């Protein structure tokens, strides 16, 4: 059949459209439908928490705490009594955790930080008020009720007995609050969320942000060149992001900190976190740190500036780090460093860093791998290193 001018033009137009069509397909596969993928998982978890009453730290007293009932208190579980000095400072002993170490506040805070995002995600999916109402019940107990609210500090976190103050490492025990902060803009769409309660919750986080920035203990955590420093930055960034509309200066400061010091302090030329590789659980802590870095990038990026793309002149950024870890998330057996001391075979859990990086870098292979991995850790030890459980709250824009 002879080629007419019309046929030729149609074929030429089709050829020209192919790259655009392929690009649109790539974009769609690098941005999976998180609401559809996690729908059943979210509702199952939220249904469980619909009937769970709050467990604030005030109902879990510890006679060894130097603070009040409202003060968070935990003890470093790798420290034991010194046999040569029974009344002296506890000494570090690796391996088996000390079963006498008090960590009920840590566990209660973790449960709270799993509960509220699950309920909020269910509210986002269904718009059913019962989920938002139950989330507010827990928020009220932890942040508003004077009798049960937690003091907005971690002054006594990871205390080494018989000391009367905590350690910088204690700040990481509140890293899960970062996802609780993500819930607040979504819950404001619930008509039962009183303006006064919203203001009081924001005030609690503002006071905690102030503690993070003025406390000597928190300052030491901020300056640590490993996952403890990342934990500080993720917490600070989440609160600054919450209050960005009223004051964007803190977020700008944190963005500068990430670009000027955090990357340089933690990432080396081959895209690894060298300080995580020296820990007893290098694989787990690398994934933990990567997830926190990814959350930080989500919070600090704007329509005009993506910190995902920032790289040092003499070193890499997040693009290199995620590319470096990708094959080891695909195949744990390819991990070239020593295996973790515990729970190595239970990893990887579905890392939010893969999903966020897929969206940031238009890498569908990251999203495809993310979809295949189990979403939730079972072991409490692993749960403590998994601060982002509801990615729906991180990739969805709240309704104004």
Q: Where are the regions a protein language model picked out?
A:
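N-terminal export signals
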Residues: 7-24
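Extracellular glycan-targeting catalytic surfaces
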Residues: 13, 25-221, 274, 299-304, ...
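Short acidic-aromatic active-site loops that bind/stabilize oxyanions
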Residues: 105-109, 226, 283
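Alpha-helical scaffold elements that line and support the substrate/ligand-binding pocket
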Residues: 115-125, 233-239, 293-294
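An alpha-helical repeat/solenoid feature that recognizes helix-turn-helix modules
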Residues: 170-173, 229-232, 286-289
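Eukaryote-skewed repeat-based solenoidal scaffolds used as protein-protein interaction platforms
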Residues: 188-260
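Long, repeat-rich segments with strong aromatic
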Residues: 238-333
